């Protein structure tokens, strides 16, 4: 018998992906599955891709309430923003992983500016690849899973900022997302005739809700950074760059980003192109590309899910589809004096359900890779 887990809000895309991963997990046992307006329907009626798995045979969605979920040892919440906070308040003492934004931000003013509802508080931030994050997740009772754009962008930029290779106040992110990132509710702008063969920008001008989340996480990376060790330190010793900020400079430094999301004609995936002004001295080194890549090799060399691609190979969103993997690549644009980093994830995988399972594995002391894969689906 494995750990009994429940999924609240399993009728959406992220919730359905959670069910797919949990059904095949060697150490987790599905208990309650709830689905809001889908309550009473068979899981396989809403998610026909799950047909035939014994763990879901005859399983119907229950109502999303504390009584239905309370017997689980761990609860995944894949609910709309606002609903998670309300439900969590009814489950004191429960171990919860929340896939919504309700508990990601610590700044009350930023939360209310971007979400327009009262701040519910902040939980442990669940991006395991951040410095010290695994240790915090392992002892946490409640964890806020990061957003999809945030996950991809933070993975792309954190190594540069931690190593002092880029300016924290001159960062531009343009990221494309598949349509599943907008959820399952029908909308005219998500109709096939509107999306196929076309791309569009939205939430332009710094208004996307993942903006403060990205800034918060990257600011904490800078304020908690320490001098590099290993390969990156050796390369930087030759190539130059600014030392990681320490003392008052680190405490007073905040990250500012310009973030523009775009909608791409694909069902799933995130491709983030991130640029940042190079720190003084980096462009003058003998091999600026190697300097940047060394920071990523140092940060993710032991990561089971984040992979620095070989020199000259750039991330392709389809390569991580259906997986919990993330691919990154970095190069120096000497002409513009900027670092260029491209990263890709599956917005339903590492950007949502896969990452939630990764968090659960860490919380429960299981192998971090249990029930997960880095192998994408091709084509």
Where are these regions (language model features)?
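Glycine-rich phosphate/pyrophosphate-binding beta-alpha loops
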Residues: 263-265, 345-351
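Alpha-helical scaffold segments in soluble metabolic enzymes
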Residues: 17, 21, 155-159, 213-217, ...
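C-terminal substrate-binding/catalytic lobe of Rossmann-fold NAD(P)-dependent oxidoreductases
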Residues: 27-67, 174-175, 179-233, 237, ...
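Electropositive phosphate-/nucleotide-binding environments in soluble metabolic enzymes
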Residues: 12, 81, 117, 121, ...
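C-terminal lid/capping helical subdomain adjacent to the catalytic/cofactor pocket in oxidative enzymes
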Residues: 344-347, 357-379
């Amino acid at each position: 018998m494995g750990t009994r887990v429940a999924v609240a809000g399993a009728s959406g895309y992220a919730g359905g992906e959670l069910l797919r991963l949990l059904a095949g997990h060697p150490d987790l046992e599905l208990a309650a599955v709830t689905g809001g307006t889908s309550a009473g329907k068979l899981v396989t009626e809403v998610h026909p891709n799950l047909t035939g798995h014994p763990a879901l045979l005859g399983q119907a969605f229950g109502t999303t309430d504390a009584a239905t979920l309370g017997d689980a040892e761990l609860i995944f919440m894949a609910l709309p923003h606002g609903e998670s906070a309300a439900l969590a308040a009814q489950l004191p003492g429960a171990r919860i992983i929340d896939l919504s934004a309700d508990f990601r931000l610590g700044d009350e003013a930023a939360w209310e500016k971007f979400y327009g509802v009262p701040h519910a508080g902040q939980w442990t931030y669940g991006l395991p690849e951040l410095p010290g994050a695994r240790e915090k997740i392992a002892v946490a009772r409640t964890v806020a899973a990061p957003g999809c754009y945030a996950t991809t962008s933070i993975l792309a930029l954190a190594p540069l900022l931690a190593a002092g290779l880029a300016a924290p106040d001159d960062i531009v992110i343009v990221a494309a997302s598949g349509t599943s990132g907008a959820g399952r509710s029908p909308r005219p702008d998500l109709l096939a005739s509107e999306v196929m063969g076309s791309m569009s920008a939205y939430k332009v001008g710094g208004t996307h809700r993942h903006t403060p989340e990205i800034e918060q996480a990257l600011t904490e990376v800078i304020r908690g950074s320490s001098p590099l060790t290993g390969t990156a330190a050796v390369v930087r010793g030759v190539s130059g760059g600014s030392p990681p900020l320490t003392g008052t400079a680190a405490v007073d430094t905040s990250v500012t980003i310009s973030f523009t999301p775009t909608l791409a004609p694909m069902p799933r995936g995130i491709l983030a192109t991130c640029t940042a002004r190079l720190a003084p001295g980096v462009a003058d080194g003998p091999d600026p590309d190697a300097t940047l890549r060394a920071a990523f090799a140092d940060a993710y060399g032991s990561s089971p899910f984040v992979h620095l691609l070989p020199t000259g190979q750039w991330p392709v969103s389809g390569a991580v589809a259906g997986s919990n993997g993330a691919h990154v690549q970095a190069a120096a644009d000497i002409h513009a004096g900027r670092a260029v980093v491209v990263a890709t994830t599956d917005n339903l995988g590492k950007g949502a359900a896969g990452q939630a399972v990764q968090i659960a594995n860490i919380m429960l002391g299981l192998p971090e890779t249990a029930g997960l894969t880095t192998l994408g689906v091709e084509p």
